[in-house]
UniProtKB/Swiss-Prot annotation:
Superkingdom: Bacteria
One Pfam family hit: Ribosomal_S11
Assembly and binders: Part of the 30S ribosomal subunit. Interacts with proteins S7 and S18. Binds to IF-3.
Cross-referenced InterPro entries: Ribosomal_uS11 (IPR001971), Ribosomal_uS11_bac-type (IPR019981), Ribosomal_uS11_CS (IPR018102), Ribosomal_uS11_sf (IPR036967)
Identification of the protein by name: Small ribosomal subunit protein uS11
GO molecular function: rRNA binding; structural constituent of ribosome
HAMAP family assigned to the protein according to its UniProt record, in alphabetical order: Ribosomal_uS11 (MF_01310)
Organism: Rickettsia peacockii (strain Rustic)
Protein task: Located on the platform of the 30S subunit, it bridges several disparate RNA helices of the 16S rRNA. Forms part of the Shine-Dalgarno cleft in the 70S ribosome.
Family: Belongs to the universal ribosomal protein uS11 family.
Length: 127
């Protein structure tokens, strides 16, 4: 009888990383990357079971941070730099959830894009 031996794939350990938080009006997307920008883990409020208007709530952002950080901690991530962007109301709760995950935060950077009157906004909604 031939026996096959499964070789376990080694997970690379990453101690320093960047957290990208995109808080839009409709959803929250969280991505953990290494310094070069390679994705370690990512999660979104819609992918965590929140649908419709509940995706844009602060609680959904908190759950999203928790799920993404659990996956990132499996790689040994300890020190993070935070890049947060977007106009959403869930920015503060996402930050608080990150501070509760016992990461060492080196910097917080706001990367929200600011329009210089480039694109015409959509027409007013009539209900």
């Amino acid at each position: 009888m031939n026996q096959t031996v499964k070789v376990k794939k080694k997970k690379k350990t990453i101690t320093l990383g960047v957290v990208h938080i995109r808080a839009s009006f409709n959803n929250t997307i969280v991505t953990f990357t290494d310094i070069q920008g390679n994705t370690i883990s990512s999660a979104s409020a819609g992918g965590n079971g929140f649908k419709g208007a509940r995706k844009a709530t602060p609680y959904a952002a908190q759950v999203t941070i928790d799920r993404a950080s659990e996956k990132a901690k499996e790689y040994g991530l300890k020190t993070i730099s935070i890049r947060i962007g977007g106009p959403g109301a869930q920015r503060e709760s996402a930050m608080r959830a990150l501070f509760g995950q016992n990461f060492v935060v080196t910097s917080i950077l706001d990367v929200s894009s600011i329009a210089h009157n480039g694109v015409r906004p959509p027409k007013r909604r009539r209900v």
